[in-house]
Amino acid sequence: MDLNPSTFVLEIVNFLVLVWLLKRFLYQPVSAAIEERRRQIARTVAEARDTQTAAETLRMQYESRLADWESEKRQAREAFKQEIEAERQRALDELEKALDAEREKARVLIERQRRDMESDLERQALRLSRQFASRFLERLAGPEMEAALLRMFGEDLAAMSPEQWQALTRALEEQEHPEAEIASAFPLKPESCAELTEMIEARTGRAVAWRFREDPALICGIRLRAGHRVLAANVGEELKFFADGAENSLGGG
């Protein structure tokens, strides 16, 4: 076909009109749709990233919480274990104290029973020894032994200290009419009685009303009683003194 200027201009105009139409009715809507789609995709990606970040944060929080929970469980188990151990130790300590107390009570009881048994045996031995000594001395007792005890009594009187004589003198002075008693297991000879009474009256400076009597409980020997003062040299009272002293010693132990 022939290309003339007017046709060329017309083609250009048609082309420009077509371009305008395409741009107006096709390119702009498509561009707008593409831009909207791009923005939607960007929003979706941003939301996905936010979701991923939130999920990662939640995951980290969950893992941290799990770690904290495990730590708390370990601490709780350790605390519970320590509490159980402390309670067990406390129970063991209380049991040990109770056992110690029971052992001490048993020891004290056994010791008391042992001491009581020993005391009973010693008392029995003392009673038997006293009975044996009494029977033995009763068989040996007689005027000869009593004469020996009387001499010993006289020697003891002669050897008394001034303080002892003063005590005997006061015992006589406390009486309105001084009296004294001499008891013996066997009858005393008159000269022996006179010797004793003269010594006492001379040393005390007092005239005394004397009584003489026999007392088989003395077994053998003599006893002088002046007021509250008693002087003796006899088997019976010596045995009683020995037995009473031993009993008191056992009772005090």
Swiss-Prot record:
The keyword Endoplasmic reticulum does not apply. GO terms for cellular component: plasma membrane; proton-transporting ATP synthase complex. Keywords: ATP synthesis, Cell inner membrane, Cell membrane, CF(0), Hydrogen ion transport, Ion transport, Membrane, Transmembrane, Transmembrane helix, Transport. It is a single-pass membrane protein. GO terms for molecular function: proton-transporting ATP synthase activity, rotational mechanism; proton-transporting ATPase activity, rotational mechanism. PANTHER family: ATP SYNTHASE SUBUNIT B', CHLOROPLASTIC. F(1)F(0) ATP synthase produces ATP from ADP in the presence of a proton or sodium gradient. F-type ATPases consist of two structural domains, F(1) containing the extramembraneous catalytic core and F(0) containing the membrane proton channel, linked together by a central stalk and a peripheral stalk. During catalysis, ATP synthesis in the catalytic domain of F(1) is coupled via a rotary mechanism of the central stalk subunits to proton translocation. F-type ATPases have 2 components, F(1) - the catalytic core - and F(0) - the membrane proton channel. F(1) has five subunits: alpha(3), beta(3), gamma(1), delta(1), epsilon(1). F(0) has three main subunits: a(1), b(2) and c(10-14). The alpha and beta chains form an alternating ring which encloses part of the gamma chain. F(1) is attached to F(0) by a central stalk formed by the gamma and epsilon chains, while a peripheral stalk is formed by the delta and b chains. This is ATP synthase subunit b 2. It comes from Methylococcus capsulatus (strain ATCC 33009 / NCIMB 11132 / Bath).
